[in-house]
C-alpha cells in the first residue's frame, strides 16, 4: 500500500494518512483548512500523550528443535473514503508511530464522524521437525511484538490448530481510521470561533481520533466497564466516582459530563461524551486524559493557562490591557495573550481578549 498523503505530526507519534481520500474524493486537498483542523487535533493529542509503542514486526517466528512456525500478521481497517475493509499485508510498525487513515464520505443520519482502531489477523505456516508444535507456538507467542508495550490492548487472538494446539496473541495499536460526514454543516477553521449553527470540525476530529486510540470496543476498554460503571482508577480519582458515568451504548462516557479543560482549567463537557453542541468547540479535559491513562497510556502534566492574564498576576482585568497592547504591537508569542489559541498573537486576538475581560 502506497503512502501518498502520509503526514507526520508532532514527533511522529500519531501519523495521519490521507491516501484513501486522495484516491477517491480528494476532499482534504481541496479543503486545506479542514485538513489543518484534523492535524491540529492530532497534534494536541500527541502533546498530551507520552507514546511508548515498541516497533512491531510483520512475521513472528517460533522454533522448537527443528520445528519452525511462522505467523504472518496483517492489519485491516475500514477505508474512510469507501467504507470497505482494507487489508495491509505488511503488519509492521515503526517504534512510537501509530498511523490513522483519514477521509470523508456520506454517512447518513445525524452522524458527524466515526473513528476506531483497526483489526488484526494472521496466516500460519511452518515445518514440523524434532520439536513439538506446541513448543514452537509458545516460542512465537513469547517473541511476538504486536502488543507494542504501551497503550491499550486492542484484541487478543485466541484459537487452536486442527491438532488442538492452542495459540494466543495480544495485539495493541496497529492502524486506525477516521471518517467525517461529507454533507454536514461544518465549521472548518479551528483558529476562529465556531460559527452559530455549525459543527466544529476540530472537535469532532479530537473525539474520533480518541476512538482510534482504544476508546470503545477494545479489550482494554471493555475490561473497564460493568454496565454504566467505569472501573479504572485514574478516572475515579479524577471524577470522584465511576458509577453511572458510562453511556448506555458502551462506547462513550455519559452526556454532559464535565471536567476542567487542560489548557485553561475551565469546566467543559468532556470530549468523550457522545454529543457536540452546535456552534461550540471542545478541548481535551482532565477526565479525557484520565481515560487514556486507564487504557494504558502515560499522559503529560499540564499547567492551565489563564487566557488574557498578560501581566501574569493570576487575574484577568484592566491591568492586562496595556501589556496586551504591547505584546500585540511587538508580534509576541506569549501564550496568555494568544486568546484565540491559534499559535500567534495578532489582531484576531483582540475580540476574544475583550470577551474574557468582560467575563464572557
Regions inferred by a protein language model and the residue ranges of each:
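Cellulosome-associated attachment modules in secreted, modular CAZymes
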Residues: 292, 300-360
Amino acid at each position: 500500500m502506497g503512502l501518498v498523503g502520509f503526514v507526520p505530526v508532532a514527533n511522529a507519534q500519531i501519523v495521519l494518512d490521507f491516501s484513501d481520500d486522495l484516491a477517491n474524493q480528494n476532499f482534504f486537498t481541496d479543503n486545506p483548512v479542514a485538513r489543518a483542523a484534523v492535524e491540529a487535533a492530532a497534534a494536541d493529542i500527541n502533546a498530551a500523550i507520552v507514546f511508548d509503542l515498541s516497533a512491531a514486526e510483520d512475521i513472528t517466528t517460533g522454533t522448537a528443535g527443528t520445528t519452525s512456525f511462522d505467523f504472518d500478521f496483517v492489519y485491516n481497517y475500514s477505508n474512510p473514503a469507501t467504507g470497505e475493509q482494507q487489508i495491509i499485508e505488511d503488519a509492521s510498525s515503526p517504534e512510537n508511530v501509530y498511523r490513522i487513515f483519514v477521509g470523508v464520505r456520506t454517512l447518513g443520519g445525524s452522524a458527524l464522524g466515526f473513528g476506531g482502531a483497526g483489526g488484526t489477523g494472521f496466516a500460519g505456516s511452518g515445518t514440523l521437525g524434532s520439536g513439538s508444535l506446541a513448543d514452537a507456538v509458545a516460542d512465537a507467542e513469547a517473541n511476538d511484538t504486536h502488543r507494542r508495550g504501551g497503550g491499550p490492548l486492542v484484541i487478543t487472538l485466541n484459537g487452536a490448530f486442527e491438532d488442538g494446539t492452542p495459540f494466543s496473541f495480544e495485539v495493541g495499536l496497529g492502524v486506525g481510521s477516521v471518517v467525517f460526514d461529507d454533507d454536514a454543516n461544518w465549521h472548518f477553521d479551528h483558529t476562529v470561533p465556531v460559527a452559530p449553527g455549525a459543527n466544529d470540525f476540530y472537535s469532532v476530529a479530537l473525539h474520533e481520533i480518541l476512538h482510534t486510540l482504544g476508546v470503545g470496543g477494545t479489550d482494554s476498554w471493555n475490561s473497564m466497564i460493568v454496565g454504566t460503571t467505569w472501573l479504572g482508577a485514574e478516572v475515579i480519582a479524577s471524577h470522584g466516582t465511576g458509577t453511572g458515568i458510562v453511556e448506555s451504548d458502551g462506547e462513550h462516557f455519559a452526556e454532559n459530563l464535565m471536567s476542567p479543560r487542560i489548557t485553561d482549567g475551565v469546566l467543559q463537557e468532556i470530549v468523550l461524551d457522545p454529543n457536540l453542541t452546535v456552534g461550540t468547540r471542545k478541548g481535551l479535559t482532565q477526565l479525557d486524559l484520565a481515560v487514556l491513562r486507564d487504557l494504558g497510556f502515560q499522559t503529560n502534566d499540564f499547567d492551565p493557562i489563564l487566557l488574557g492574564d498578560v501581566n501574569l498576576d493570576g487575574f484577568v482585568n484592566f491591568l492586562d490591557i496595556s501589556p496586551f497592547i504591547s505584546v500585540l504591537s511587538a508580534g509576541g508569542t506569549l501564550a496568555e495573550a494568544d486568546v484565540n489559541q491559534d499559535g500567534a498573537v495578532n489582531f484576531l486576538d483582540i475580540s476574544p481578549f475583550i470577551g474574557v475581560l468582560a467575563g464572557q
